Amino acid sequence: MAPATAVVTPQTAFKTDLPVEKTAHNTVVKSEMGALSKAYPTYSLDESFSFAPIRESTVSRAMTRRYFSDLDKYAESDIVIVGAGSAGLTAAYYIGTRRPDLKIAIIEASVAPGGGAWLGGQLFSAMVVRKPADLFLNEIGVPYEDEGDYVVVKHAALFTSTVMARTLALPNVKLFNATAVEDLIVKEGKDGKQRIAGVVTNWTLVSLNHGLQSCMDPNTINAHLVVSATGHDGPFGAFCVKRLASAQLVSNLHDMRPLDMNRAEDLIVKGTREVFPGMIVGGMELSEFDGANRMGPTFGGMMFSGIKAAQEALAIFDERKAVNEKYL
């Protein structure tokens, strides 16, 4: 008989199996120490129920005012992250928590962020994460089963929804989803050197249908650094490295190699770096750039590549900002 699997619940994870005590107006959950930890409201949904009144234009203004305020605020960002998959979201969380003074804009082409991290692989639910990437699960509060050299999150969506919630709750992070990066801003400074200075954006539906309509010009976001984690080759995948290559700013891409889990995850993490001044590449996009192996349905490499990208960004940000302000 196989030994029982240890289930690890980080201290920041939510408890759902605690004893309850009902009062007249609330259901109160007791903590393991017996103290009252959370009071749930009573939902009175009888025939007298009604929502607070609202006018349709109020809803429209509530959305548009905030969105256009965000567009104005993040038109000059400190760091832009392209791609809100497991690597991109992890990078945004790491930078946002370690440097709350920085403005971080995330650009995601899909309506739904998360990339390929909503399922473990081939429509299966569980997510396998090789150690020591369980450290990040502990930090954000995702419970898992400890299997020795690896851990298993019961559903990949539990990780993705958690890292997304933790990241988007940060006051210095803004996600622009359903928004595609169509090009890069590349500037030659007074020192004669070229640098990435931001991204060119458009609504994804526009980007997908340029051939079916009259021209619609894009928008722009300036940034001192761009972190690209757009995944492997696809309609929007590996976009930034493909654009660097087509603009002859880097040599030709080497294309992703066949699957080798042990080799792939180590190489992705170790190889995450600034590939062109102002452009850091991580995640599966890096495998298209370097010609590294794919790793398949194991996600520790994506998480730690995101952290490595964030560490690289934080290590050079102040220098890049100073150089840009001096020469651009």
From Swiss-Prot:
Its EC number is 2.4.2.60. It is found in: Cytoplasm; Nucleus. Gene3D superfamilies: 6.10.250.2840, FAD/NAD(P)-binding domain. Its cofactor is Fe cation. Keywords: Cytoplasm, Iron, Metal-binding, NAD, Nucleus, Thiamine biosynthesis, Transferase. During the catalytic reaction, a sulfide is transferred from Cys-215 to a reaction intermediate, generating a dehydroalanine residue. Disulfide bonds: none annotated. Substrate binds at residues 87, 108-109, 116, 181, 217, 232, 284, 294-296. The modification 2,3-didehydroalanine (Cys) is found at residue 215. It catalyses: [ADP-thiazole synthase]-L-cysteine + glycine + NAD(+) = [ADP-thiazole synthase]-dehydroalanine + ADP-5-ethyl-4-methylthiazole-2-carboxylate + nicotinamide + 3 H2O + 2 H(+). Binds 1 Fe cation per subunit. InterPro entries: FAD/NAD-bd_sf (IPR036188), Sti35 (IPR027495), Thi4_fam (IPR002922). Its main location: cytoplasm. GO terms for cellular component: cytosol; nucleus. It holds the Pfam family Thi4. GO terms for molecular function: cysteine-dependent adenosine diphosphate thiazole synthase activity; iron ion binding. One of its GO terms (biological process) is thiamine biosynthetic process. It comes from the Eukaryota. Induction: Repressed by thiamine. Homooctamer. Belongs to the THI4 family. Involved in biosynthesis of the thiamine precursor thiazole. Catalyzes the conversion of NAD and glycine to adenosine diphosphate 5-(2-hydroxyethyl)-4-methylthiazole-2-carboxylic acid (ADT), an adenylated thiazole intermediate. The reaction includes an iron-dependent sulfide transfer from a conserved cysteine residue of the protein to a thiazole intermediate. The enzyme can only undergo a single turnover, which suggests it is a suicide enzyme. May have additional roles in adaptation to various stress conditions and in DNA damage tolerance. This is Thiamine thiazole synthase. It comes from Schizosaccharomyces pombe (strain 972 / ATCC 24843) (Fission yeast).
